[in-house]
C-alpha cells in the first residue's frame, strides 16, 4: 500500500478542496489516462484496488503509471470514546484530488483494452472520472 516513508508532522487538518488542478492535468507518460471530474479524497486502498484491477486485465502487456500519491494522514478516534481528550491517531492515508487531475496512465495496449482496464479502475474510485486519449498535434504544413 502507498504511504510516505516519513513525515514532518503525524497529523494534519482536513482542509478543503477549491478550484481545479493546475498541475498533473495532462498525459505525460502513457497514451491513455483517467482524469478526475470532481474533487475528493482517494485512499491508498482504493488506489491499490484500481491498480490491481487494471494490471489483472491488461495481463502481461502494457504499462500502468499511478500519478497520485496518498500523502495526507486521516485520523480516527476509537469507537465508543467520549468527546475530547485530543485528536485521534492516524488511521489511513489519502491523496487529495482536484477536478482535472490525471490519476492513472496506460501505454502499450490497444485503445479498447485501455478503455476497459480504466473502466474497471473507475468503479473502484469514489469520484467521477473520464477516459483520456493523447491527442497528437496534427501538422498542417503552413509555411508562410
Curated annotation (Swiss-Prot):
GO terms under cellular component: cytosolic large ribosomal subunit
Q: Does the keyword Nucleotide-binding apply?
A: no
Disulfide pairs here are none
Q: Which keywords annotate this record?
A: Ribonucleoprotein, Ribosomal protein, RNA-binding, rRNA-binding, tRNA-binding
What the entry lists under PROSITE patterns is as follows: RIBOSOMAL_L16_1 (PS00586), RIBOSOMAL_L16_2 (PS00701)
Q: Which Gene3D superfamilies does the protein's record reference?
A: Ribosomal protein L10e/L16
Q: Subunit details for this protein?
A: Part of the 50S ribosomal subunit.
Extract the NCBIfam families matched here. rplP_bact
Main role? Binds 23S rRNA and is also seen to make contacts with the A and possibly P site tRNAs.
Q: What is this protein called?
A: Large ribosomal subunit protein uL16
Q: Which gene encodes it?
A: rplP
Amino acid at each position: 500500500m502507498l504511504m510516505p516513508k516519513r513525515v514532518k508532522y503525524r497529523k494534519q487538518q482536513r482542509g478543503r478542496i477549491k478550484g481545479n488542478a493546475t498541475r498533473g492535468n495532462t498525459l505525460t507518460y502513457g497514451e491513455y489516462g483517467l482524469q478526475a471530474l470532481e474533487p475528493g479524497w482517494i485512499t491508498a486502498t482504493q488506489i491499490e484496488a484500481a491498480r490491481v484491477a487494471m494490471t489483472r486485465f491488461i495481463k502481461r502487456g502494457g504499462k500502468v503509471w499511478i500519478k497520485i500519491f496518498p500523502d495526507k494522514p486521516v485520523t480516527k478516534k476509537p469507537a465508543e470514546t467520549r468527546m475530547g481528550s485530543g485528536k485521534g491517531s492516524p488511521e489511513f492515508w489519502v491523496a487529495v484530488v482536484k477536478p482535472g487531475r490525471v490519476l492513472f496512465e496506460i501505454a502499450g495496449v490497444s485503445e479498447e483494452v485501455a478503455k476497459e482496464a480504466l473502466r474497471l479502475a473507475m468503479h473502484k474510485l469514489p469520484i467521477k472520472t473520464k477516459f483520456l486519449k493523447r491527442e497528437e498535434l496534427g501538422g498542417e504544413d503552413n509555411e508562410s
